[in-house]
């Protein structure tokens, strides 16, 4: 049972409490602390929490329990436990509100609005949930969790409406001067929404260091004592839920057809050459061309996520189950992070497969750093990152903290850099996402023209691929990864999407093979050993 403290007095909550197997747990911060905070009238809500000794072995065990009581769940974690973000895995269920954008309509709960400016509508919603940074709390205490699709870009860039809108038909003027390149006909539309977020005011944080759980409930700061008592009661309900034996459920899924690609090898190579014509004519410098692969699938992606954790541990591991979509992923790359006013983005570009021995691994890393084409591509994307952060950062604050480091993952290695800035007064997490998305590593340069051509040349919409996935905290902090190395399921099909950066001297066959190689960890997690058709 959780108890709360006022000044020096600990008081057991009133009302009937659920039975638990644990001794009373102290709730923090105290009611006295939040009473003082409420008087400041700066914030509308605040988190309260209690710590719970856990019988769960992994965050996945907690997730399995939550799925017995809610279809809508998420798990955000990091396989890099040495990093600060890796200490906690975050879970949630039963969202307070769902927000999604589909068919040019924004849905906020039961309210439908024309999707003219979805970002501003979400900003207005978040103003109702303004929370302080409190000591001894994890980095995420509640907020929005979900994804923003690549095509969401058209809401802030009206010039892209034709290219990224309802179809992939070519917009007027999207071929380079002197060329006859035409758009590839769309073969099927990616079923992901333009935006799919869930608002959670309760969070379960799994401490990977101590294997304890931190249970978090956000309470309103008006009538603070009443809401504090209610919050403590809700914490006790969480304790009871987590101590209730969960029935076993089948979490395995199976690919039931060959995986087919939107582009055949010949089509992809021909499209690379058409992109290179635009580069040679000075229309763009680089473009990331992608290929979508899909298959029929039965069952859940939870088992697939478990395999991804094992074979492709990454800085951003995520499982997300929304109204009509299930997503599992292991992204290596941050889109943008905002923590207490400091912005970071981490461009990754340039790829080699991992070696089979330490010596071969080192040799491939040296080869990658010596590759002028790969380094030139990476430098271009670092410059894009600096420019993106510069639009919302204080003058002179944008710096490259780390340059041309080798970042190694389970199957591949990349060249990585770190760009930092300090966000200007008047800008927020939503502005930061808008400034950086889509990442140059998933679009090209110049970014807007590259995106226009992507809409022209690619056969299907990208959806989550190349978009953003993560959280925006009630405190204003935010951490979003790039939507890559992911698998999602909808309407009985799974989708895997990978891309390659095309520059003037790219070899088309090599770029096609890079797309297939990047998909290998996803295929392995799905248990698929066949060829791509």
Predicted regions and their residues:
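Extended alpha-helical targeting/anchoring segments
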Residues: 2-8, 14-174, 178-533
């Amino acid at each position: 049972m959780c108890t709360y403290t006022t000044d020096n007095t600990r008081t057991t909550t009133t009302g009937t409490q659920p039975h638990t197997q644990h001794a009373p747990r102290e709730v923090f911060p105290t009611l006295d602390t939040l009473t003082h905070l409420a008087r400041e009238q700066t914030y509308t809500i605040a988190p309260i929490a209690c710590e719970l000794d856990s019988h769960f072995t992994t965050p996945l065990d907690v997730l399995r329990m939550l799925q017995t009581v809610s279809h809508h769940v998420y798990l955000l974690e990091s396989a890099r436990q040495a990093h600060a973000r890796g200490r906690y895995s975050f879970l949630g269920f039963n969202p307070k509100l769902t927000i999604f954008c589909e068919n040019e309509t924004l849905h906020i709960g039961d309210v439908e609005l024309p999707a003219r400016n979805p970002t501003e509508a979400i900003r207005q919603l978040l103003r109702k949930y303004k929370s302080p940074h409190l000591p001894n709390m994890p980095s995420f205490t509640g907020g929005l969790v979900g994804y923003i699709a690549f095509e969401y870009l058209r809401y802030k860039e009206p010039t892209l409406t034709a290219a990224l809108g309802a179809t992939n038909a070519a917009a007027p003027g999207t071929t380079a001067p002197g060329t006859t390149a035409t758009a590839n006909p769309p073969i099927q539309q990616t079923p992901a929404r333009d935006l799919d977020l869930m608002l959670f005011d309760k969070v379960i944080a799994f401490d990977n260091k101590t294997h304890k759980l931190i249970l978090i409930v956000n309470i309103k700061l008006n009538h603070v004592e009443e809401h504090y008592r209610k919050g403590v009661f809700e914490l006790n309900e969480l304790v009871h839920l987590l101590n209730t034996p969960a029935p076993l459920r089948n979490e395995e899924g199976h690919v039931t057809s060959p995986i087919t690609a939107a582009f055949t090898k010949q089509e992809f190579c021909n499209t690379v050459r058409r992109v290179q014509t635009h580069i040679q004519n000075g229309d763009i410098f680089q473009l990331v061309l992608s290929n979508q692969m899909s298959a029929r699938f039965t069952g859940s992606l939870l088992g697939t996520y478990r395999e991804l954790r094992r074979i492709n541990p990454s800085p951003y591991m995520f499982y997300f189950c929304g109204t009509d979509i299930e997503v599992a992923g292991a992204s290596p790359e941050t889109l943008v992070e905002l923590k207490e006013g400091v912005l970071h983005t981490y461009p990754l570009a340039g790829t080699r497969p991992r070696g089979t021995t330490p010596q071969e691994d080192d040799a491939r890393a040296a080869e990658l750093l010596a590759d002028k084409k790969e380094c030139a591509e990476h430098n271009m994307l670092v410059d894009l990152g600096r420019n993106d952060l510069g639009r919302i950062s204080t003058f002179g604050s944008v710096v490259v903290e780390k340059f041309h480091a080798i970042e190694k993952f389970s199957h591949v290695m990349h060249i990585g850099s770190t760009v930092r800035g300090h966000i200007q007064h008047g800008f927020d997490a939503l502005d930061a996402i808008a400034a950086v998305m889509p990442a140059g590593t998933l679009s090209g340069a110049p970014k807007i023209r590259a995106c226009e051509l992507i809409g022209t040349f690619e056969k299907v919409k990208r959806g989550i691929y190349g978009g953003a996935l993560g959280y925006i905290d009630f405190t204003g902090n935010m951490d979003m990864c790039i939507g890559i190395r992911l698998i999602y399921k909808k309407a009985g099909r799974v989708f895997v999407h990978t891309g390659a950066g095309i520059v003037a001297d790219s070899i088309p066959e090599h770029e096609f093979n890079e797309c297939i190689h990047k998909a290998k960890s996803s295929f392995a997690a799905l248990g698929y050993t066949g060829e791509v058709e």
